[in-house]
Amino acid sequence: MPPPQGDVTALFLGPPGLGKSALIAALCDKDVETLEAPEGRPDSGVPSLRAAGPGLFLGELSCPPAAPGPWAAEANVLVLVLPGPEGNGEPLAPALGEAALAALARGTPLLAVRNLRPGDSQTAAQARDQTAALLNSAGLGAADLFVLPANCGSSDGCEELERLRAALQSQAEALRRLLPPAQDGFEVLGAAELEAVREAFETGGLEAALSWVRSGLERLGSARLDLAVAGKADVGLVVDMLLGLDPGDPGAAPASVPTAPTPFPAPERPNVVLWTVPLGHTGTATTAAAASHPTHYDALILVTPGAPTEKDWAQVQALLLPDAPLVCVRTDGEGEDPECLGEGKMENPKGESLKNAGGGGLENALSKGREKCSAGSQKAGSGEGPGKAGSEGLQQVVGMKKSGGGDSERAAALSPEDETWEVLEEAPPPVFPLRPGGLPGLCEWLRRALPPAQAGALLLALPPASPSAARTKAAALRAGAWRPALLASLAAAAAPLPGLGWACDVALLRGQLAEWRRGLGLEPTALARRERALGLASGELAARAHFPGPVTRAEVEARLGAWAGEGTAGGAALGALSFLWPAGGAAATGGLGYRAAHGVLLQALDEMRADAEAVLAPPEPAQ
């Protein structure tokens, strides 16, 4: 088995406003995930990172305000993005020049890019000559220069962009044979991230720094999902209900019908994007919708005021690949959820509950259940689809039977052509009524219809709308709880300072517990929203929740204190990975170690799961 190849990072450095983000987006595939700096910290001095392909990551950092030197030293390839003579400030800032010279001295490949803008006074040839002279005067004449024409990233067949892409891939292929992999079965923190943690501990902002690193590690391996919500009205209402937002909340979709496809990333998992897509009145999607990015969505929710018609279904077909999930929400609330999505159970074609399917039968039953949900009977709410499902949709084809002979003779002579076949007509996609309590059946159907990686991303991105969804999401969060627990110990042990371990434990756990509380729909605003929707008395749902909130530093310290006896065990557990950091582990820096942090997380998650189940339980019928 050949050893794993290394991972290469190309860092794009330059002043803000030169189109670095657009350039990286043009070089990358749309299905990869970007790790952005945390919201509210635009000048955090930490690069964003995006995967351009197997083993190649493209980073971006604006200098100023960030200092380029430390990050340039970490890069395997350095790309300078330079302004034109019309730009404000110096064409090449001293700090950028020094970082580039140091990179050349280390033997780091150096590239330079000049982005032409619409209205620039220089031609491409003039810009090339002017930029080459600038590089020569700074001692950087060895850099490969690329001059990109205006709107190069948004047009196909840009020759200079393809040259740049080929140069990056060529450098990456050469370096991957020499560099170690950035990830090989475990999460690794780079020196720059550890330095940022230590700096934040000394100057403030430790919780924000750790939360950003944690969310970045979580999202690095998370699937991208583009989910379209298309219709002529009320698409914003459906998006906000799925995201658990009120109109006017940050990130909420407006009530007005969009004029073009508009993205709304999930607040906790921005790799899951809900798109509001307007539909035209001529029987097809509007030109803007059909030509927007992405060209095809991973799944689509059609929003109609009543029962969908054949024309409604035909309008959205161009926005989807043939096998992509398609479903409808009718906003009048009429009809029932499809029968195959009953709460807590799903029947396989033979009527056996999944709970009775042992061993490998569970996967087979789930697969058959998915087929039944997509091709099975649609009762009330299915409307006027392209065909009728159910018993009327079955056509009996009677095979030829040979006469004479006994049962054994007929059995021996039986062939596939002689059997009786049942042909199912293609059923319309399922239709879910919009109810005040949310769309739990729709969310469950989407998770079953999507590929596993995207289904998992959707599960973590949306707040649960039913007790079973809360249990499923809590189980997924529990399976990933080792990441934040290990991260606190890694950060503290790799940069041992007195008190840093305890500070990392408290800051990271506080941020993680607060995120889980939001993700499970236990914030006061979420509870009040559900109370209003269901017509419950104010405070009724809050009384069912017992996990203390908001998550305070004192609460986290108290929970960690209860685990104080686990500190030694936590340090021993970290000893298995002692080659990654100085001896002593988290215990040497005052932290409680992996086991304690993990125990606090799991205990709190169990409490929050119980609260979410209680809050989402169906209201008792009025007497």
From Swiss-Prot:
- What subunit structure does UniProt give? Interacts (via LIR motif 1) with GABARAPL2. Interacts (via LIR motif 2) with MAP1LC3B/LC3B.
Protein name listed in UniProt: Immunity-related GTPase family Q protein
Where the record places motif LIR 1 is 186-189
Tell what the record comments on domains.
The LIR motifs (LC3-interacting region) are required for the interaction with ATG8 family proteins GABARAPL2 and MAP1LC3B/LC3B.
From what organism does this protein derive? Homo sapiens
- InterPro entries referenced in this protein's UniProt entry, alphabetically: G_IRG_dom, IRGQ
Query: Phosphothreonine-modified residues are where?
Result: T203
What Gene Ontology molecular function terms does this protein carry?
protein-macromolecule adaptor activity
Q: Which GO biological process entries does UniProt record here?
A: positive regulation of autophagy; protein quality control for misfolded or incompletely synthesized proteins; substrate localization to autophagosome
What results from changing E74R? Answer: Abolished interaction with GABARAPL2
